[in-house]
A protein has these predicted regions:
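Short helix-capping and inter-helix turn/linker motifs at the boundaries of alpha-helical repeat units
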Residues: 2-6, 138-142
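Non-catalytic DNA-recognition/assembly elements of restriction-modification systems
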Residues: 6-38, 149, 154-157, 161, ...
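Sequence-specific dsDNA recognition surfaces
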Residues: 10-11, 25-74
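Conserved hydrophobic/aromatic beta-strand scaffold that supports enzyme active sites
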Residues: 45, 104, 149-151
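A short beta-sheet element
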Residues: 69, 74-132, 136, 143-147
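Interdomain signal-transducing alpha-helices
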Residues: 115, 160-163
């Protein structure tokens, strides 16, 4: 992708400049937290990993309380709040359910995979972590009440699609190099 012609300051430390024409928007203005509780008997269990949101393996350890899970709809962005620093998050391609430690974000409007890339980026993960709390890194968590005010860069929908197309192309090229 080409560099943009001009940039403007954001006033935000994790991303100090964005292209002119983009906006900085609070996560709360883009997503609503989905907190609906469901059963894993009605909604297939999903795992949130560094590879994204996937069907849970049959061999995965399950809680005894399968009734106490959060609903996930295809298109929701899900963050594993216990593995957020490892990038365990992504847009779910499936309807299903996740454990209560996950943050499920329902897009307010149609969203693109731009947010899948943005919210999994190293700089965002560090900002997400900075807004959390805990006694040690392994027991650190960021709640939606803390993350909802994080400002993120939002280009036009057309630019989002172009960015996703470019990143998909680069990822595919990289995946051919490393099997």
């Amino acid at each position: 992708m080409k560099k943009y012609g001009s940039y403007k300051p954001t006033g935000v430390s994790w991303i100090p400049y964005i292209p002119t024409g983009w906006n900085m928007v609070k996560i709360n203005d883009l997503f609503i937290e989905r907190r609906e509780k469901v059963s894993d008997k009605d909604y297939a269990p999903l795992s949130v990993t560094k590879f994204g949101v996937l069907p849970q393996l049959e061999t995965a350890v399950k809680t005894k309380d399968g009734e106490n899970r959060k609903k996930v709809c295809a298109g929701d962005f899900v963050i594993n709040s216990r593995s957020d620093r490892r990038g365990s998050s992504g847009i779910s391609p499936l309807d299903g359910s996740v454990s209560l430690i996950n943050i499920v974000l329902q897009p307010r409007k149609g969203t693109s995979y731009y947010f899948h890339y943005l919210l999994r980026s190293h700089t965002f993960i560090e900002e997400f972590y900075r807004n959390g709390r805990g006694i040690v890194a392994d027991l650190w968590t960021t709640r939606y009440s803390e993350m909802k005010n994080i400002l993120v860069p939002v280009p036009s929908y057309e630019e989002q699609l172009a960015i996703v197309e470019y990143l998909n192309w680069k990822s595919a090229a990289f995946n051919h190099i490393i099997p």
